[in-house]
C-alpha cells in the first residue's frame, strides 16, 4: 500500500463510521457499467462541501488492490448489485488530490514535476521487479507495469480544477497542466477508469481540447448521477424523522437544487450540521466567504444587478448557459456570471425553463451579506436597515415602516416588470431580515395594483406575530388594511392560530410618499 498508489480504505471507513452517513454507494453501479468502455472517463463537478471527496474515497476503497474492503460495504446498497464482486479490490488505483500538490509547489511546472516523481516512486515501490524502460516517464512506466503484470489502473483525481481557480489568468500554466493530464490519461489502454472531481466542468478552455474524452456531469446537467450530487428529499426526510427536525424548515434553508428525472437535492453538509447541532442556520459561510460571491455580483454587466434584486425577491431569471467557457475570468455578459454562480452553488438551474433562481434561505443570506457591503447605493442601505423596519412593524411604528418602504421602493421602482412584482421586490428588500424569523409567502393578484407578502413565524419563534404586508399605489393605507381583511388574511394563514399584524402601505406615484397603517388582530 502506497501513499498515492493503492492508498487503502481508511478515509472511506471514517466516512461510514460517522454518526451520519447517507449511502451513495449505488454510484459504483454506474462506474462499473462504464468500466473499460468508451465512457470510462468521468468528470463530476459540484460546489464545495457537496461530498466530492467522500465519493472519491469510496471509489478508491472499492477498486484499490491495497486493501480488503468487502466488510466495509456490508449493509450498503452496492453490496446487492451483481457487479459488486467482479471489480472489488482488483485494480491499481492512483488517488491524487491535485490541491495538495499545488499547495506544495510554487508553479504549475514544479507541481507537475513533483507529481511525476512521487507517483513514480510509489509505482517502483509497489513493483520493484518490473523492467522499466524509462523511470522518469510516468505514463510509459505505467504501461510497463500493465504489460508485465496484466493489472489495469484506475485514476481518481480530486480537485482537478484547482489550477484554473488559483491561476485564473495564467493561460500558459493552464495549458501546461492540461497537456500533463492529456499525456497522463488520454487513450491509455492500461487505464480502465478515470474519475475526476472539481467545481468547474472540463471543456472549453479556449481552443485547448486536451480532455475532450470526458463525460461531464455538472450542476447544469447531472444526468444519471443527479441523485449523488447531494442528499435527496427522501434521504433528508428520513434524517428529519431520526433527529426530530422540522422538514419544512430544512427544505426552506437547504433545498433548492433541481435536476432532470430526480427528486429535489439538498446541500449535504448543511443538512448534516443542522441534524448534528440541532440548529437550522447558515452553515455555508463556515466553508466559503461571501466575498467570493461579492466579486461576481459586483461586475459591471447591464442587467446583472437587476437580476440579483429580482432573485432576492424570489423571481426566476432566464439564462443562457451555452456560451460559458468554464473558467473564472472570461465573462462576456451577465449570462456567463450567472452560469458560474450555478457551478459554485449560489444559483440553481431549471433546465426545463432555462432559468436560474436562488435555491434556499441559506444562500439568500449570502447574497444579502454580499450586497449589504457592496456599493449598491439604496439597495445596500435597505438591506442593512431591514432589521430596523421589521422591529418597527413589531412595535407598530407606522412612520418608520413607511420610511423603510420608501427607501427600498426608490431602488426597485425602475425595474421593467409588471407593477405587482415591483411592489413585491420592495417588500422583500425592506423586510429582508424577517426571513430569519419567518417563512415567507407571496400573493400577487395580477392587474390589481397591489402585492401581499405573508410572514408566518418559524417554529422556534412562537412569540412572534404573523405579518401580512400589503403595498398599494395611489389608493390609501387604510384601504390596504381593508383589502387584507376582505381576503381573510390570505390562504397562507388558514392554519395559523396566533396573533397577526396587518401592515397596509400606500404610495403616491406623483410625489413618491409612502403612508402606513398597522393593526393587530387576535385570530
Regions found by a protein language model. Name each.
Residues 174-179, 473-490:
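Mg2+/Mn2+-dependent nuclease catalytic core
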Residues 427, 451-455, 464-473, 487:
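Conserved catalytic cores of phosphodiester-cleaving nucleases, focusing on short active-site segments
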Amino acid at each position: 500500500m502506497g501513499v498515492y498508489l493503492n492508498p487503502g480504505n481508511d478515509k472511506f471507513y471514517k466516512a461510514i463510521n460517522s454518526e451520519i452517513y447517507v449511502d451513495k454507494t449505488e454510484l459504483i453501479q454506474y462506474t462499473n457499467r462504464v468500466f473499460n468502455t468508451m465512457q470510462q472517463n468521468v468528470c463530476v463537478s459540484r460546489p464545495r462541501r457537496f461530498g466530492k471527496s467522500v465519493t472519491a474515497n469510496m471509489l478508491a476503497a472499492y477498486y484499490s488492490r491495497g486493501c480488503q474492503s468487502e466488510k466495509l460495504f456490508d449493509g450498503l446498497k452496492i453490496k446487492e448489485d451483481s457487479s459488486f464482486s467482479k471489480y472489488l479490490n482488483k485494480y491499481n488505483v492512483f488517488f491524487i488530490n491535485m490541491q495538495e500538490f499545488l499547495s506544495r509547489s510554487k508553479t504549475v511546472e514544479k507541481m507537475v514535476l513533483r507529481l511525476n516523481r512521487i507517483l513514480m516512486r510509489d509505482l517502483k515501490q509497489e513493483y520493484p521487479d518490473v523492467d522499466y524502460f524509462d523511470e522518469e516517464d510516468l505514463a510509459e512506466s505505467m504501461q510497463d507495469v500493465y504489460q508485465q503484470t496484466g493489472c489495469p489502473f484506475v485514476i481518481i483525481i480530486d480537485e482537478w480544477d484547482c489550477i484554473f481557480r488559483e491561476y485564473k489568468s495564467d493561460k500558459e500554466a493552464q495549458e501546461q497542466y492540461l497537456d500533463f493530464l492529456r499525456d497522463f490519461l488520454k487513450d491509455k489502454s492500461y487505464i480502465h477508469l478515470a474519475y475526476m472531481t472539481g467545481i468547474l466542468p472540463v471543456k472549453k478552455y479556449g481552443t485547448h481540447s486536451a480532455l475532450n474524452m470526458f463525460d461531464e456531469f455538472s450542476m447544469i446537467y447531472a444526468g444519471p448521477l443527479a441523485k449523488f450530487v447531494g442528499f435527496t428529499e427522501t434521504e433528508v426526510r428520513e434524517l428529519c424523522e431520526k433527529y426530530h427536525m422540522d422538514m419544512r424548515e430544512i427544505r426552506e434553508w437547504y433545498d433548492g437544487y433541481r435536476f432532470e428525472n430526480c427528486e429535489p437535492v439538498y446541500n449535504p453538509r448543511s443538512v448534516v450540521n443542522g441534524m448534528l447541532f440541532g440548529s437550522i442556520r447558515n452553515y455555508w459561510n463556515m466553508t466559503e466567504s461571501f466575498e467570493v460571491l461579492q466579486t461576481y455580483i459586483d461586475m459591471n454587466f447591464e442587467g446583472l444587478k437587476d437580476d440579483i434584486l429580482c432573485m432576492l425577491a424570489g423571481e426566476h431569471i432566464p439564462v443562457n448557459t451555452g456560451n460559458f467557457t468554464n473558467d473564472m475570468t472570461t465573462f462576456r455578459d451577465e449570462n456567463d456570471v450567472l452560469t458560474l454562480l450555478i457551478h459554485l452553488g449560489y444559483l440553481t438551474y431549471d433546465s426545463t425553463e432555462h432559468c436560474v433562481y436562488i435555491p434556499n434561505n441559506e444562500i439568500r443570506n449570502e447574497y444579502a451579506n454580499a450586497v449589504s457591503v457592496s456599493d449598491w447605493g439604496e439597495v445596500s442601505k435597505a438591506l442593512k436597515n431591514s432589521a430596523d423596519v421589521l422591529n418597527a412593524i413589531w412595535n407598530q411604528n407606522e412612520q418608520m415602516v413607511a420610511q423603510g418602504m420608501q427607501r427600498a421602493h426608490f431602488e426597485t421602482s425602475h425595474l421593467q416588470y409588471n407593477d405587482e412584482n415591483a411592489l413585491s421586490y420592495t417588500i422583500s428588500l425592506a423586510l429582508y431580515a424577517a426571513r430569519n424569523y419567518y417563512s415567507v409567502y407571496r400573493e400577487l393578484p395580477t392587474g390589481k395594483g397591489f402585492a401581499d407578502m405573508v410572514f408566518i413565524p418559524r417554529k422556534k419563534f412562537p412569540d412572534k406575530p404573523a405579518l401580512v404586508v400589503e403595498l398599494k399605489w395611489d389608493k390609501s393605507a387604510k384601504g390596504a388594511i381593508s383589502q387584507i381583511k376582505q381576503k381573510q388574511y390570505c390562504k397562507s394563514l388558514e392554519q395559523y392560530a396566533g396573533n397577526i399584524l396587518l401592515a397596509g402601505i400606500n404610495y403616491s406615484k406623483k410625489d413618491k410618499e409612502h403612508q402606513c397603517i398597522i393593526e393587530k388582530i387576535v385570530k
